[in-house]
Structure formats: C-alpha cells, structure tokens
C-alpha cells in the first residue's frame, strides 16, 4: 500500500478497522448477500462501530439482491466485463459508490473508468510486481 501511495495511487481502505469488506466467501458462508450485509450491520451496532460496508457481487442476481437489501455504502463489481460494468453502473444509478475489481490491467483501466465507477482496484499492482535486484556494499 505504501508503494501505491508513493507511485501516486490512493488507498480507499487500509484494513477491516476502517471499512467492512464483505467478499464472496463471506457471502457464501452467511447464506447470501442479504444475510451477510445484515450480520455486518448488526455487528457494527453491537460493537458501537460506525463503519462503511462494501459488498462484493459476482453477477447481476447478486447485484439486485444487494440493491434490494441496501444497508451498504459501496458495491464492488467483481470480474465484471467492461460492458457488464457499464450496465451495472446504470442499474445502480448513483445510489451507492461503485468499485470495479478483478482482472483489471493497465491496458483495460481506462475502459473501466469510462463506465463511471468511483473506484478501481488493480490487483496487478500487488500480485504482479517486477522486482528490482538491488544490493548494498559495506565500505570501511
């Protein structure tokens, strides 16, 4: 995350202490989008926390369930094509922040941005980094 900042990027979330991110595994374990969001909201209330909730959706059925449920502030479109992202942004219609994630590269970044999303996650920044071979020599 530090290298992203140094390179001019921004981090919209540092950890689970500043925003709840409900991923696909959480959704599956909870028994669906509505159950996962509701449990996260109940947890926040019980702990006296005022945290934003982001829900990851994998398809249009999950997107519709999230929209029907509400209670979150951001929707992450996971592995949506550019065309599907554009359609999803139209369906969301500004009611929630929208993040695109999954399979986005520096070559496709502009196309996703032009869909009108608020945030774009580019995993290649962290999982496909080319290392630089450096060494230091001690001099007496």
Give the location of each predicted region.
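Hydrophobic faces of well-ordered beta-strands that scaffold small-molecule active sites
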Residues: 12, 18-23, 53-55, 75-77, ...
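Short, charged, intrinsically disordered terminal tails
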Residues: 124-140
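Catalytic cores of alpha/beta
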Residues: 60-71, 80-93, 104-122
């Amino acid at each position: 995350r530090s290298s992203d900042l140094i390179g001019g990027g921004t981090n919209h979330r540092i950890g689970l202490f500043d925003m709840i991110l409900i991923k696909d595994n959480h959704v599956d374990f909870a028994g669906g989008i509505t159950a996962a969001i509701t449990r996260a909201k109940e947890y926040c209330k019980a702990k006296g926390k005022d945290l934003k909730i982001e829900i990851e959706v994998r398809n249009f059925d999950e997107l519709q369930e999230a929209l029907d449920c509400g209670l979150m502030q951001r929707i992450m479109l996971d592995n949506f094509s550019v065309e599907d992202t554009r359609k999803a942004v139209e369906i969301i219609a500004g009611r929630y922040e929208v993040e695109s994630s999954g399979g986005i590269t520096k070559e496709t970044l502009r196309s996703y941005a032009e869909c009108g999303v608020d945030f774009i996650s580019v995993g290649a920044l962290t999982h496909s980094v080319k290392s630089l071979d450096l060494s230091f020599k001690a001099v007496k």
